[in-house]
């Protein structure tokens, strides 16, 4: 069960949040690429208490054929929460929230994947929430982005996602569950980042209320967090490439010794 079952008296005490973070700090993040052998690309990611896994298949032929687009690949994205991912057991299958998250996430990736290189094909992205906490959609977007790179899918850059919330009147980066449940606002972002620079906003949603100035501040706070996450995504991919290189060296050395 959650440590906080009822609304806490305060969400920020002496400048610190309930989990000890400052307003501009991310939750702990762990990223591991290429965790599923049968997928073309995959990623396991932890973001706070969120635990998610993403798998990419394709580009591959579309069935049935009448769904094919002769000019470009179609992108299919499925966000799903495992029945055991939340404290109260969830019914299997997609609900309205999962369908909505799948739709906006697909649109974010459609803007960055070079679809025109793969006409009449499909790129399928499956993300499964194994353990849910605040910000599961942002965690899944980050995992899916790494999985796409792992699959070798050409993109204009990385999709990197983080949310900004408002708790006790203070903007906070990467809200925890209590801030998400009892705060005044929640604003998930996804950015297109290329070569360490933010190119554009690929996704922006809003739940709650912020002033115009707060929205501007939230965008800057989200950019700061996204660039940190981008470096973690990049490091996870580089680690995987190094592992592949070492495996190839071992195979080559073994062949020479034979």
From Swiss-Prot:
Q: Name the GO cellular-component terms.
A: cytoplasmic exosome (RNase complex)
Superkingdom classification of source: Archaea
Q: Keywords, A to Z?
A: Cytoplasm, Exonuclease, Exosome, Hydrolase, Nuclease
DNA damage found in the keyword field: no
**GO function terms (MF aspect):** 3'-5'-RNA exonuclease activity; RNA binding
What's a BP term from Gene Ontology annotated to this protein?
Answer: rRNA catabolic process
Which EC numbers characterise this protein's activity in its record? 3.1.13.-
Localisation: Cytoplasm
Q: Which InterPro entries match?
A: ExoRNase_PH_dom1, ExoRNase_PH_dom2, ExoRNase_PH_dom2_sf, PNPase/RNase_PH_dom_sf, Ribosomal_Su5_D2-typ_SF, RNase_PH, Rrp41
Point out the signal peptide segment. Answer: none
Say which enzyme class the record assigns.
hydrolase
Similarity comment text for this entry: Belongs to the RNase PH family. Rrp41 subfamily.
User: What does it do?
Assistant: Catalytic component of the exosome, which is a complex involved in RNA degradation. Has 3'->5' exoribonuclease activity. Can also synthesize heteromeric RNA-tails.
Note the subunit structure: Component of the archaeal exosome complex. Forms a hexameric ring-like arrangement composed of 3 Rrp41-Rrp42 heterodimers. The hexameric ring associates with a trimer of Rrp4 and/or Csl4 subunits.
List, alphabetically, the HAMAP family matched: Exosome_Rrp41
| UniProt protein name | Exosome complex component Rrp41
């Amino acid at each position: 069960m959650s440590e906080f079952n009822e609304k806490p008296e305060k969400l920020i005490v002496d400048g610190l949040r309930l989990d000890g973070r400052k307003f501009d700090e991310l939750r702990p993040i762990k990223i591991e690429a290429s965790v599923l052998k049968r997928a073309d690309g995959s990623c396991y990611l932890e973001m706070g208490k969120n635990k998610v896994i993403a798998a990419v298949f394709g580009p591959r032929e579309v069935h049935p054929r009448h769904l094919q687009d002769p000019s470009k690949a179609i992108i299919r994205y499925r966000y799903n929460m495992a029945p055991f991912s939340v404290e109260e057991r969830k019914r299997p299958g997609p609900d309205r929230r999962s369908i909505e998250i799948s739709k906006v996430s697909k649109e974010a990736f459609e803007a960055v994947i070079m679809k025109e290189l793969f006409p009449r094909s499909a790129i399928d992205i499956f993300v499964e929430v194994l353990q849910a906490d605040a910000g599961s959609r942002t965690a899944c977007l980050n995992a899916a982005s790494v999985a796409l790179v792992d699959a070798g899918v050409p993109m204009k850059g990385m999709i990197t996602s983080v949310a900004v919330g408002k708790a006790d009147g203070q903007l906070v980066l990467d809200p925890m569950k209590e801030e998400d449940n009892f705060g005044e606002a929640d604003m998930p972002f996804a950015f297109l980042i290329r070569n360490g620079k933010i190119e554009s906003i690929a996704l922006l949603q809003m739940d709650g209320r912020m002033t115009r100035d707060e929205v501007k501040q939230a965008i800057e706070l989200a950019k700061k967090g996204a660039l940190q996450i981008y470096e973690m995504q990049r490091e996870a991919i580089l680690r995987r490439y190094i592992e592949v290189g070492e495996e190839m060296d071992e195979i080559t050395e073994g062949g020479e010794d034979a």
